[in-house]
Amino acid sequence: MKACRCITILTGAGISAESGISTFRDSNGLWCNHHVEDVASPDAFIRNPALVQLFYNERRRNLLLSSVKPNKAHTALAKLEEELSGKGKVFIVTQNVDNLHERAGSKNVLHMHGELLKARCTATGNVFEWQKDIVGDVDRCPDCGFLGTLRPHIVWFGEMPLCMDEIESILSTTDLFVAIGTSGNVYPAAGFVKRAQFYGATTLELNLQEGSNSTLFQESIYGKASSIVPTWVDQVLKESLKK
């Protein structure tokens, strides 16, 4: 493996699956008999804001359970960033809305789909740390003071992902692009591998099983994230000592 000045890592739901993050979907893809798309869109929030808040309040409470912790894959990526400090940069672009990367110690994390432990004011656009339930007819925006303007700081269906300009800039300088625990179905993230290749990066997929865009990667390794990610990180760090 050649020396890398910049490693960009895209993470999806697969990296957090072993940490006890509930998907809140049953076998039919439903949440309390509602399609998830019906509680995760701007139109849904307009039609029934209380239902949307209930959905995200449950997800937020689940994330804050003591049983939900970073797993070995998260801690391995934090180790990679720390030990390559001074030799190169490690960026994590995550589709996940949890904070497990940060809790594991990663610093350079971009949340392209938002963050569950933050709220956003629909009146001002300001974003706030938020760890309790959002109750529309009770909670006021800490900034403007308006009632009923707070929503989860989450990118809903039909909304533009966050940090896209910054992500493109990072991809343009990336030597190695790695996708971990992603389905390859969700765009624009599923297209990052092509963007990275366009800029000359080597590409690697670490996944539980083959994803929809697996054929685009130069190499793929399959298995549980908590197993294959630490092994890969150890290999990268071992190679870096030879440089």
Curated annotation (Swiss-Prot):
Say if the entry is tagged with keyword Flavoprotein. no
* Catalytic residues in the record: H113 (proton acceptor)
Which CDD domains did the record assign? SIRT5_Af1_CobB
Q: Where does Zn(2+) bind?
A: C121, C141
Reactions catalysed, as given in the entry: N(6)-malonyl-L-lysyl-[protein] + NAD(+) + H2O = 2''-O-malonyl-ADP-D-ribose + nicotinamide + L-lysyl-[protein]; N(6)-succinyl-L-lysyl-[protein] + NAD(+) + H2O = 2''-O-succinyl-ADP-D-ribose + nicotinamide + L-lysyl-[protein]; N(6)-glutaryl-L-lysyl-[protein] + NAD(+) + H2O = 2''-O-glutaryl-ADP-D-ribose + nicotinamide + L-lysyl-[protein]
Q: For binding substrate, which residues are annotated in this chain's numbering? A: Y56, R59
Q: Which Gene3D superfamilies match?
A: SIR2/SIRT2 'Small Domain, TPP-binding domain
> What is an example of a GO molecular function annotated in this UniProt entry?
protein-malonyllysine demalonylase activity
Q: Quote the subcellular location field of this record.
A: Mitochondrion
The residue ranges crossing the membrane are none
| InterPro entries the record matches | DHS-like_NAD/FAD-binding_dom (IPR029035), NAD-dep_sirtuin_deacylases (IPR050134), Sirtuin (IPR003000), Sirtuin_cat_small_dom_sf (IPR026591), Sirtuin_class_III (IPR027546), Ssirtuin_cat_dom (IPR026590)
Residues that hold NAD(+) according to the record: 12-31, 95-98, 181-183, 225
Co-factor note (free text)? Binds 1 zinc ion per subunit.
Q: What is its main location?
A: mitochondrion
* Limits of the Deacetylase sirtuin-type domain: 1-239
GO terms (BP aspect): post-transcriptional regulation of gene expression
PROSITE patterns annotated for this entry? SIRTUIN
Cellular compartments per GO CC: mitochondrion; nucleus
- Required co-factors: Zn(2+)
| Keywords on record | Metal-binding, Mitochondrion, NAD, Transferase, Zinc
Q: What is the superkingdom listed in this entry's lineage?
A: Eukaryota
Please give the NCBIfam families that the UniProt record associates with this protein. Answer: PRK00481.1-5 (NF001755)
Q: Which family does it belong to?
A: Belongs to the sirtuin family. Class III subfamily.
What is said about the domains?
Answer: In contrast to class I sirtuins, class III sirtuins have only weak deacetylase activity. Difference in substrate specificity is probably due to a larger hydrophobic pocket with 2 residues (Tyr-56 and Arg-59) that bind to malonylated and succinylated substrates and define the specificity.
What else does the entry mention about this protein?
Answer: This protein may be expected to contain an N-terminal transit peptide but none has been predicted.
Q: What is this protein called?
A: NAD-dependent protein deacylase SIR2rp3
Originating gene: SIR2rp3
